[in-house]
Amino acid sequence: MTPPRTTTPHPTRRTLLRLAAGTILTAPLSTLLKAQPTPSMHTRPIPSTGEPLPVVGCGTWRTFDVGDDLTAQARLAEVLRILFAAGGSVIDSSPMYGTSEAVTGTLLTQLAAHQKAFVATKVWTQGREAGIAQMEESMRRLQQPRIDLMQIHNLLDWRTQLATLRDWKASGRIRYLGITHYTSGAFDEVEAIMRSEKLDFVQIDYSADDRAAEERILPLAAERGIGVVINQPFGGGSLLAQLHGRPLPGWAAEIGCTSWAQVLLKFVLAHPAVTCVIPGTGRPEYMIDNVHAGIGDYPDQALRKQIVAALSA
């Protein structure tokens, strides 16, 4: 379970977080967020096409695996409303994530939001025919006639699946293709594929306490024109647990941060090779927190060093 977040609120966010806690229930959170005089979320160009992509999205591992639980689905619908109201669009899933794909598809249909979403999912199986069958099932679950980004999950049988993804991209069934891994231990293979193959995206782990991607993967992505999606920006939740209850340093206000979660997300987004970050959440108040990291200034190199130092203080 993700630990509670420590937030230093300003008036707009105080109202929203009180609403999220159930203190005031006069309107949906997403409606109030949309009504605030808040700038739109930053976008960054997808290197292979120049298409602008909002910098903060939503991961669905565990958090969207709620099956037919209507109460949980209603909460997740509010999460997505907040994402869209803030100008976000990226939703990342996988057939590995239980019912997450099906729940995402149901919610996008309920919200009439398929056109607002940039839907990313993955193929995670061995063999060409099995890969095709799995991707077709993902499209059915997501209720998407076309997938924006199809990724090879954890590099599983990547040569076979990449050939299929190229065919699907050429035929218009997917718009972009890529590879993913969740641990820096796989970076040697990730790097080799990035050097040998033409990719639109790579999805990797990167956080203020796990900066291995800075050594080779992020510079190579910039060199090769590959978009970068970041998973586990909170170190799998361990960073939030470590920082829980600790007051924000004064320098956080310099980049408009009112929570440690925003500081950690802005640390990741400050790297110029990063295209988008996809923190997973199933709670509306956390999505409000996350999307604010896509607004305002990012830390410079000196401030990034202070963020890293704060983790070991």
Language model regions located:
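Conserved, mostly hydrophobic/aromatic
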Residues: 46, 58, 91, 104, ...
